[in-house]
């Protein structure tokens, strides 16, 4: 079996590149999207995606909206939400949250908590 595939969804190019590198270092095959619409297109086209790492605050479709749509389309997909502006209190129960700035230990713990 190949490496697990993750979809990083982040509108900030620098943050997106940082997250991509971080997940590659954790052994993932990484795809990235610059907004929610792009993420949904990739999710539809790439059935191997098993985990999403999603910024909560994005223009257009927010991370919370994206998580809801993704779960409707792919009920078994695991989602980790992230933000530097909101706290865990806005994150739905059962969804992992990692605050920005990211620490590798927190991200690794959230991934393990996602039960891939």
Stretches found by the model and what they are:
Residues 10:
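Conserved acidic carboxylate
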Residues 32-41, 63:
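Helix N-cap/capping motif at the beta->alpha junctions
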Residues 41, 64-76:
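Short amphipathic alpha-helix used as the core "switch/output" element in two-component signaling
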Residues 55:
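Active-site residues of response regulator receiver
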Residues 102-115:
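C-terminal output helix
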């Amino acid at each position: 079996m190949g490496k697990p595939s993750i979809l990083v969804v982040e509108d900030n190019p620098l943050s997106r590149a940082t997250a991509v590198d971080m997940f590659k270092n954790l052994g993932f095959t990484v795809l990235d999207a610059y907004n929610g619409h792009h993420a949904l297109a990739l999710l539809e086209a790439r059935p191997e995606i098993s985990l999403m790492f999603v910024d909560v605050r994005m223009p257009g479709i927010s991370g919370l909206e994206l998580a809801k749509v993704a779960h409707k389309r792919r009920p078994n997909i695991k989602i980790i939400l992230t933000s530097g502006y909101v706290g865990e209190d806005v994150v739905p129960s059962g969804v992992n949250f990692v605050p920005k700035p990211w620490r590798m230990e927190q991200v690794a713990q959230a991934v393990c908590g996602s039960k891939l």
